[in-house]
């Protein structure tokens, strides 16, 4: 059985601190992950003004806008991430949440793209990602069969390689909700590689997914669950 491609999802668990990000990258490398993944958003494009202006106390200020902006890295930080990943010899890539962020990631020579579960319903975004012609991991959390049909059709039409990632979008996911047999159903229905993006505590479900022949495994990482 071939080992799955291991993705350490850092997301925004760096808390806006490049030193924390580098520690997470090093830990992922030391633990045997093949790559680390970040999330990139253009805050003003992803959230509406009403949401951004709501009161929210955080280390970055008193509004949701302050918090969201405080958690975003920009080019200076991503340049450092790019260089550091080369230094420790690990791949990195990002899941963009809007087209501007997708274009931003073009600044770097990345092998992969990632469609977050929430973005699988955005037809325009899917088309733009598929046009990049980078191998793309497509998470299927919360999606219907029609959503997945549409995404697969777009990537095939653009001749862009992809794999689906079975995902249950609860945090943390209960073991009894894993529904791992979906992995086999996705393989059969779409004749493609299928991975697993896990949100559960522990490793038992992930190990079971590996036994079902997943080609990629994504797990969230942090230095401290209280951060």
Short names for language-model regions:
Residues 1-227:
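Catalytic cores and adjacent flexible loops of soluble metabolic enzymes
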């Amino acid at each position: 059985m071939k080992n799955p491609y291991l993705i350490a999802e850092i997301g925004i668990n760096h808390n806006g601190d490049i030193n924390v990000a580098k520690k997470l990258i090093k830990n992922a490398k030391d633990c045997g992950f093949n790559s680390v993944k970040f999330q990139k958003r253009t805050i003003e494009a992803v959230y509406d003004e009403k949401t951004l202006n709501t009161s929210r106390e955080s280390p970055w200020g008193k509004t949701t806008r302050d918090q969201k902006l405080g958690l975003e890295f920009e080019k200076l930080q991503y340049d450092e991430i790019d260089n550091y990943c080369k230094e420790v010899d690990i791949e990195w890539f990002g899941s963009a949440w809007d087209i501007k962020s997708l274009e931003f990631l073009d600044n770097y020579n990345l092998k992969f793209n990632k469609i977050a579960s929430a973005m699988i319903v955005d037809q325009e975004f899917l088309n733009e990602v598929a046009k990049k012609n980078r191998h793309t991991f497509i998470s299927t959390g919360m999606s219907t069969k029609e959503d997945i049909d549409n995404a697969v059709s777009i990537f095939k039409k653009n001749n862009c390689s992809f794999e689906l990632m079975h995902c249950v979008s609860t945090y943390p996911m209960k073991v009894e909700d894993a529904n791992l047999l979906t992995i086999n159903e996705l393989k059969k229905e779409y004749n493609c590689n299928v991975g697993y993006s896990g949100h559960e505590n522990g490793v038992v479900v992930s190990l079971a997914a590996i036994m079902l022949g997943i080609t990629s495994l994504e797990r969230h990482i942090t230095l401290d669950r209280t951060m």
